[in-house]
Regions:
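Hydrophobic positions on the alpha1 helix immediately C-terminal to the Walker A/P-loop
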Residues: 101, 105, 143
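Pre-Walker A adenine-sensing motif
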Residues: 71-81
């Protein structure tokens, strides 16, 4: 791989360094996971066996979930948990609470992380999981502050402004000590290309493990192709297709937050529909699940 990288860098001056790095990351991950992702045809018997094993795992697990619990009972009952290779779209208009819901799910999954050692020295997640959170809109510091506020029940604006008393300060300090080692990894790089996002997710899985990816939000991820003639719809379609491919490759669920178009605001009935997905393209085709965040009280207050 090193010789190939050196040769390409020497002979192809047009190739951007970032693309070379992404290509090498892909090759390294493929080498580490040799045989686990591209296995070709499997017999129907093997597929049946795997499906029965999934059902057995759900039967043995508390709550009867075959996937990772979101921490929200009603949602888990509808989805049966979040399953490996699923692309889950969480969409809504601004101020509906998309990021708040996503951070709550991420925190719950990371907080419940349990694993067991395997005979070959690797670890297997038995509950919860390691979370990779790509926050393209909010900084890691802002995200952490939001989690601390949720965990302690102290309003976020009070923490930001420093208008807390000594007791609340102690609560915050104790909370930080309790949750600082959770397996929740935040990447707050803005305008991240989908190729770089995938490379970083592979690296995280290789170094720390990975059970859930969250992307906040879909429309802020950029195309890796940068072709002048591509429309924004084509770019977003490329992103969703690559996120679905990444979910299958890493065998983890991917939650991608998405904005909705302004058409929602012009209707009398503000409840979102699939057609409201902003720059939708192939979002609904690539997604396994599409969920909408809707708060009727928000519109009544206005």
């Amino acid at each position: 791989i090193g010789d190939e990288l050196s040769a390409t860098a020497t002979t192809d001056a047009e190739t951007q360094p970032r693309k070379l790095i992404e290509a090498v990351e892909q090759q390294l991950f493929n080498l580490a996971e040799a045989g686990s992702t591209s296995r070709g045809f499997v017999s129907f018997k093997q597929a049946l066996t795997e499906s029965v094993e999934t059902a057995a795992a759900a039967y043995e697990r508390d709550g009867g979930l075959s996937g990772i619990s979101s921490g929200l009972k009603a949602l888990d009952e509808k989805l049966g948990g979040m399953h490996p290779s699923d692309l889950i779209i969480l969409a809504g208009r601004p101020s509906m609470g998309k990021t708040a819901l996503a951070t709550n799910i991420a925190f719950d999954v990371a907080r419940n992380y349990e694993f067991e050692e395997q005979p070959d020295g690797t670890t297997k997640t038995t509950k919860g999981g390691v979370v990779g959170f790509f926050s393209l809109e909010m900084s890691a510091e802002q995200l952490a502050m939001r989690l601390i506020a949720d965990y302690t029940g102290i309003p976020g604006y009070m923490i930001r402004q420093g208008t807390i008393d000594a007791t609340q300060y102690e609560e915050i300090r104790d909370a930080v000590l309790e949750i600082q080692s959770l397996p929740l990894y935040i990447d707050d790089t803005g305008g991240l290309p989908i190729g770089a996002l995938a490379a970083r997710a592979r690296r995280l899985k290789r170094t720390h493990g990975l059970d859930l990816i969250i992307v906040d939000y879909l429309q802020l991820v950029t195309s890796s192709r940068n072709r002048p003639g591509d429309s924004r719809v084509q770019e977003v379609s490329e992103v969703t297709q690559n996120l679905k491919a990444l979910a299958k490759e890493l065998e983890v669920p991917v939650i991608a937050l998405s904005q909705l178009s302004r058409n929602v605001e012009s209707r009398e009935d503000k409840k979102p529909q699939l057609s409201d997905l902003r720059e939708s393209g192939s979002i609904e085709q690539d997604a396994d699940v599409v969920m909408f965040v809707y708060r009727e009280a928000y519109y009544k207050e206005r």
